[in-house]
């Protein structure tokens, strides 16, 4: 499976117990949203391998999942840090004005004055709204709330996001 055919939805945090379960961090709207997909693609650095999802549980501090072929703690621990992706073709279409985080990461962020603030490095979920983590070429990091007041236009096809945000913020 090619990188462009997959959408990263989370990552494996480590082993959970001794029977091959893994702790996961999901970047989905609903914490257990990954449990809806029968096959997960796990990988690092563009090398992906499919795993059949067998079972899942919502734990107080993490999600836990059992994947086919991962049968002991050592096998689960070996997956620590791998990304979890789902084929784009299996995901629902994003609604108008909605975006998958994976589609925003790497986009250039430009303000109304035409100044480049940097590229989207990641996003944060705060509860009230999502926040763009923008890293500039100068190493400066900016946190821009992903709300209409500040994010004026998102154009993935052009690789950019237009914001109402100053260089000095």
UniProtKB/Swiss-Prot annotation:
Domain PRC barrel: residue ranges: 96-169
Disulfide-linked positions: none
Domain of life of the organism encoding this protein: Bacteria
GO BP annotations, alphabetical order: ribosomal small subunit biogenesis; rRNA processing
Pfam families noted in UniProt: PRC_RimM (PF24986), RimM (PF01782)
Major localization class: cytoplasm
GO cellular component: cytoplasm; ribosome
Localization per Swiss-Prot or TrEMBL: Cytoplasm
MF (Gene Ontology): ribosome binding
Keywords, comma-separated and alphabetical: Chaperone, Cytoplasm, Ribosome biogenesis, rRNA processing
Notes on the domains: The PRC barrel domain binds ribosomal protein uS19.
Quaternary structure and interacting proteins, as annotated: Binds ribosomal protein uS19.
Function of the protein: An accessory protein needed during the final step in the assembly of 30S ribosomal subunit, possibly for assembly of the head region. Essential for efficient processing of 16S rRNA. May be needed both before and after RbfA during the maturation of 16S rRNA. It has affinity for free ribosomal 30S subunits but not for 70S ribosomes.
HAMAP family named in the record: Ribosome_mat_RimM
Family designation: Belongs to the RimM family.
Protein's name according to its UniProt entry: Ribosome maturation factor RimM
